[in-house]
UniProtKB/Swiss-Prot annotation:
Species annotation: Arabidopsis thaliana
GO molecular function terms attached to this record: ABC-type transporter activity; ATP binding; ATP hydrolysis activity; ATPase-coupled transmembrane transporter activity; efflux transmembrane transporter activity
Taxonomic lineage of the native organism: Eukaryota, Viridiplantae, Streptophyta, Embryophyta, Tracheophyta
Any one biological process term the GO annotation gives: response to hydrogen peroxide
Domain ABC transmembrane type-2: 384-590
Coiled coil region boundaries: none
Membrane topology of the entry: Multi-pass membrane protein
Location of the ABC transporter domain: 53-304
Protein name: ABC transporter G family member 14
Gene: ABCG14
Cited InterPro entries: AAA+_ATPase, ABC2_TM, ABC_transporter-like_ATP-bd, ABC_transporter-like_CS, ABCG_dom, ABCG_transporters, P-loop_NTPase
Location of this chain's protein in the cell: Cell membrane
Principal place of residence: membrane
Amino acid sequence: MPQNCIAPRPEEDGGVMVQGLPDMSDTQSKSVLAFPTITSQPGLQMSMYPITLKFEEVVYKVKIEQTSQCMGSWKSKEKTILNGITGMVCPGEFLAMLGPSGSGKTTLLSALGGRLSKTFSGKVMYNGQPFSGCIKRRTGFVAQDDVLYPHLTVWETLFFTALLRLPSSLTRDEKAEHVDRVIAELGLNRCTNSMIGGPLFRGISGGEKKRVSIGQEMLINPSLLLLDEPTSGLDSTTAHRIVTTIKRLASGGRTVVTTIHQPSSRIYHMFDKVVLLSEGSPIYYGAASSAVEYFSSLGFSTSLTVNPADLLLDLANGIPPDTQKETSEQEQKTVKETLVSAYEKNISTKLKAELCNAESHSYEYTKAAAKNLKSEQWCTTWWYQFTVLLQRGVRERRFESFNKLRIFQVISVAFLGGLLWWHTPKSHIQDRTALLFFFSVFWGFYPLYNAVFTFPQEKRMLIKERSSGMYRLSSYFMARNVGDLPLELALPTAFVFIIYWMGGLKPDPTTFILSLLVVLYSVLVAQGLGLAFGALLMNIKQATTLASVTTLVFLIAGGYYVQQIPPFIVWLKYLSYSYYCYKLLLGIQYTDDDYYECSKGVWCRVGDFPAIKSMGLNNLWIDVFVMGVMLVGYRLMAYMALHRVKLR
């Protein structure tokens, strides 16, 4: 009977007592399962609630559409991505998934991390239990791409993560100390105060970014750590450093699973276990040190000293070792079928028997810890999440918000407009109404286009952080809205202040303040529509195209260019917030009983001027109310659209 994983139990005081694991020296060569030795290392935080990960017969299929040759009809066909993957990983163990591109490594990792969007067949168990919120909070998932805010420093990135992911029972100073410990553990002391960097400016190196991503997950002291291609795009020395760090984390009692594409020989020998996939089917599972010997026993031995990983990847591609000439597709297919058949015969049956005999789980949470994990859906309160996200957002966008180019753009347009409408006489009512319409158009469309980019640009970050249960969507949404207000309101305020007085509009402080409030009101409505477009489409190109069409329609139906809209399409103007803004600005500047000099010595009633008569200056509170409905409605639409974003 095979040996089972024996877990370290958490002490009552929160420490970890490492119990001896069974000596596998006598059975290692006979058993498919291999078990690690957990060793405490100085400066390395031990896992408090170790997890045994067991997966059995994991099968995942997707439907792909194909065009039929007859009459161009569409037919759906199933493609198998994963085909019966089985294995087990114990605490302190480092499992690597190897295989060529498209073999299903990332899909399997997503299934193990509870992040597969569609259902799959088979069982994935964590200490004998299915995936749950409790397990999710003990799991760290490091994606292949490092999704980080470019304008935050390394310390700020980890500190804000700690504020959101660590429990509220810890003080702010304690969380900061924890961040310092993680930085020291991962060797990030040299770049603590360096910015992450992005496409437009240089920051820390790729290896340091990867360690920051790992550090974000290490802050919660995960029991299960999953990493997708942690060495992708890194040089061999940096890749070795990263994997050495991961190996140290595993030695602290964590269950570590990683996908890796082409490890060096040094890296390969750090793995405890290996799963080798070929077109979604397993062809090897077991100790990394025994893989070459296993394939040699099948007749796939090499006379050269090669990197074991290179040999395994060649076999997964159907290429036998020591092949001098290029193999045909049929030969590759034959090799793959041989290896899959050998796996079923030599490993699969034995592995399933051992998993059946293994205990369902051998770790138990302390009663208090289990109770807390189950009862608390979130580590922090809504208000706390909102304030932290607001602080982070303001700090991240401090360089972008008051961008010199944007300030120059708005101020230059304001001065140019002021010069064009310089002290417009009261008798030139056509020009004065044109200036008011310019207010409604410019500040109806400028914030709309800026807001369209908001959520598509942050989509990857939103998916990453919400997948890990970092915060509520509502707290993020409110923080994002409030954080954008300083720039969204400061620039139009400066704009109106400049052009209002230069244009010679009604020189009354009350009228000026009311006009400014209407413009700011329109800005918030336009921003809401932009957020809704971005959240609905989550694609910058599509969202800007839709925004362009919408702004054109709103411009034409705004009440200035077309004063007598045909009855069958008159409803269009009631959808345009530019129409309501323009009408409110007219109502603030004029009343129906005001008079202007329509020709020399002749005074005409303002209410009879065609452009104003077609708009009407009555019932302005209805327009205020309609814009209020738009302001709230557009944001609700954006919020509901964000709920539809898939987190997996």
